[in-house]
């Protein structure tokens, strides 16, 4: 009885347990479905977020490419064959024209293409894609750092904003690296467009690249440095035909390529000077006149040749004709060996006897006047305009003559001189130098000397023997002093500082006994004749033009 009663009860219990398990399974399925839904939404959200980030990254790269330029751009060809999405190779786009945001290139719009997306984006030239607010909040002290002081616009300027600092850095970089016009065929440079007025006053910097001239050219206004002279020894000027006797004269033609040499071997030689071959052009033999002096007229039309004779020669370069002139009417001079020619090429002044100075016209070759000193005449020098003549001699005084009135304007004692032996005047007429028989050279300002001030601005006493020859170069920055009595007796004076060049004469070199010296019209060459019959040639590096 008990067994039958327990059986239905156990069945009911099992039924309830099965029902409960079924409900639990349904609950778990519902919970599982909810979890799947949540996971799906989360996954979808993450994908959308990832796409948004990728889109933002693409936009940022696009802006960076537009503003700063792309160093490379991946190629789309072949991407369908790649599984990892990486580019097979890159194309260099660095040569694409870039326009910095600080340049003002006009108001025209420019279209730049994005090769990855195939989009065309129009941007406005000169406008920044974005502005960094932090730049305005930062201050930079450009006065405290040495390398940043060049960015100052005013001397007392110190703190500037970050944006201003960046703008000045960019402007300074653009100034140092202006670029080239030929590399950008679509660019047009207009005068006055640059913010730096100094760079556009003499033309655009790109004009330099259109020529084959030297980029660094020394202007005529450059000052020669004192101390050491930069020079090079070249092939002897008369190496093609050396003289058999002492060289008494060397003189450059006004075109700077033609040099004459003359000496006691009675030959007048012409050389074309290039510093390498120095080709001989012509040699003329004067049978009856050992040459003491020869010189071109400043206009280059004639050569005046003289010796220890009563006559002199005139050689016409165009006609290649020699004329023998003299003796001069009314004069009894036995020698016309020393003379000077005026800068206007109109007058020749000869040293005469007993203190007389003989003035001869270069056109008629006739005597046009005489001047008389108290002592003997030893040296002469014309002023720059040919209107005045300086003379010195045995009485130790310097005379200044007016050739228009044939009268002496002023005479003064040459300080420390008992006998003047050499005179020379600068081409600008501001200075003249007087040499003596004791090796003393006094340099005067002509205006002060004529005004009564007899004190020289400099006395050079580096030589101990008689001064035979002196010469200013074309810009009066160098004064050459020559004494023929001793070997290597040549000094070069730096006139602006009134000091002697320490490296001249050249060490360990033999100049023999120097006799004469001349500078080319642009002072690029210096020629010096010696008693051995050679004409030494030097290149002065400071002067670019011969």
UniProtKB/Swiss-Prot annotation:
GO CC terms, sorted: Cul4-RING E3 ubiquitin ligase complex; nucleolus
Motif (DWD box): 389-404
Domain of life from the UniProt record: Eukaryota
Gene Ontology BP terms: rRNA processing
Similarity-based family: Belongs to the WD repeat UTP18 family.
Domains: entry comment: The DWD box is required for interaction with DDB1A.
Designated name of the protein: U3 small nucleolar RNA-associated protein 18 homolog
Species this protein is from: Arabidopsis thaliana
